[in-house]
């Protein structure tokens, strides 16, 4: 699966604190005194300037080596993607930009409390990718890959797309030069990112980045994934279906399993294990033992209240608990002490490859 992303520049904000929302078109830019034509960022900066994106730091200077703050970058993104900001001063306008960028998912919560901090390259790339809808997948999802932090995955993708150099690191502070070159690239170039192969039939009806969903599927035991695929089941990311179901049931749902349609419907990746617990219940033929265990031990278990409503929810949550905490001795001891028969039953299932 490949995703191609392309953006065309319409309007982009200033890179520097000194430039504040010009209300009238400026004269054609003739260059900056501190930016020779031989500079590697010259083309990018001139593109931004000619499109009235930046006027530099004043007095004919661009200051390419000046660090870029979260506040400045937020303004940049809001102008780039025509997001309205409000205020009568730079402080108000840029704070509005930070808040808007956060709402759009372009910046994280830290940006709200610390808008004046300087951006590192990993954060800059993550934000740019989010704004441009360029998907980032964890390296562990590819053959031979290992799990990496978000910023490291962004650096990896940045290098693959030639948006940063091989020597660049996630934690290094970025400058106006870096921001200008990155912005110019994501607004004017097309990018192709190959998605990792899903272990089951996956339908992305919501059209979202499937990274978190693929990571959630990695938690499901391989024998179950194989059985799911062989049985002709589908894992479907479908916000509309879940929303309609929530309204019908008058409750908040994030996942559902349809035995008739052989489909797991998901809106949040965190529901994946629970819904696969329902699939396992189905694959085992809804054993009477599950009802017996529910009646005998559910109320004394340490599981959430929802797990105590019926045998199917109890079994699904037992599966989630087992997969999530199987390496945590204390958690497993607590489970065994509270529900010894259920513990023994789940242990036997796990030992026997979950009935595969």
Region locations from a protein language model:
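Active-site-flanking segments in enzyme catalytic domains
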Residues: 203, 216-356
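Export/targeting segments at the very N-terminus of extracytoplasmic proteins
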Residues: 31-32, 53, 212-220
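Beta-strand-connecting loop/turn residues
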Residues: 13, 52, 60, 260-262
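Alpha-helix boundary/N-cap detector
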Residues: 92, 149, 208-211, 215, ...
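Sec-dependent N-terminal signal peptides of Gram-positive bacterial secreted proteins and lipoproteins
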Residues: 4-26
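N-terminal propeptides
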Residues: 18-197
């Amino acid at each position: 699966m490949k995703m191609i992303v392309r953006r065309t520049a319409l309007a982009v904000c200033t890179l520097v604190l000194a430039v504040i929302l010009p209300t009238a078109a400026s004269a054609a830019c003739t260059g900056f005194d501190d930016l020779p034509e031989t500079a590697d960022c010259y083309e990018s900066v001139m593109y931004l300037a000619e499109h009235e994106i930046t006027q530099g730091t004043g007095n004919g200077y661009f200051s390419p080596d000046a660090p870029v703050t979260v506040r400045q970058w937020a303004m940049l993104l809001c102008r780039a993607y025509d997001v309205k900001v409000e205020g009568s001063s730079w402080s108000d306008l840029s704070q509005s930009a930070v808040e808007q960028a956060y709402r759009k998912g372009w910046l994280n919560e830290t940006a709200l409390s610390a808008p004046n901090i300087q951006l590192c390259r990993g954060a800059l790339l993550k934000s740019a990718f989010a704004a441009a809808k360029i998907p980032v997948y964890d390296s562990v999802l590819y053959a031979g890959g290992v799990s990496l932090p978000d910023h490291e995955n962004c650096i990896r993708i940045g290098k693959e797309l030639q948006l940063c150099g091989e020597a660049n690191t996630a934690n290094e502070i970025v400058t106006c030069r870096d921001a200008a070159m990155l912005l110019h690239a994501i607004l004017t170039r097309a990018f192709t990112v190959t998605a990792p192969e899903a272990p089951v039939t996956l339908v992305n009806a919501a059209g979202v980045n499937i990274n978190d969903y693929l990571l959630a599927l990695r938690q499901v035991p391989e024998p179950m994934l194989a059985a799911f695929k062989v049985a002709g089941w589908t894992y479907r990311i479908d916000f509309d279906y879940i929303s309609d179901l929530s309204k019908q049931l008058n409750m908040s749902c994030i996942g559902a399993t349809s035995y008739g349609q052989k489909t797991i419907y998901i809106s949040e990746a965190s529901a994946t294990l629970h819904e696969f617990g329902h699939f396992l219940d189905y694959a085992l033929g809804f054993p009477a033992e599950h009802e017996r265990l529910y009646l005998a031990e559910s109320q004394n278990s340490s599981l959430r209240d929802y797990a105590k409503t019926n045998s199917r929810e109890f079994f699904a949550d037992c599966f989630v608990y087992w997969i999530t905490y199987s390496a945590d001795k204390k958690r497993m001891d607590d489970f065994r002490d509270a529900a010894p028969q259920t513990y023994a039953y789940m242990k036997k299932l796990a030992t026997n490859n979950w009935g595969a």
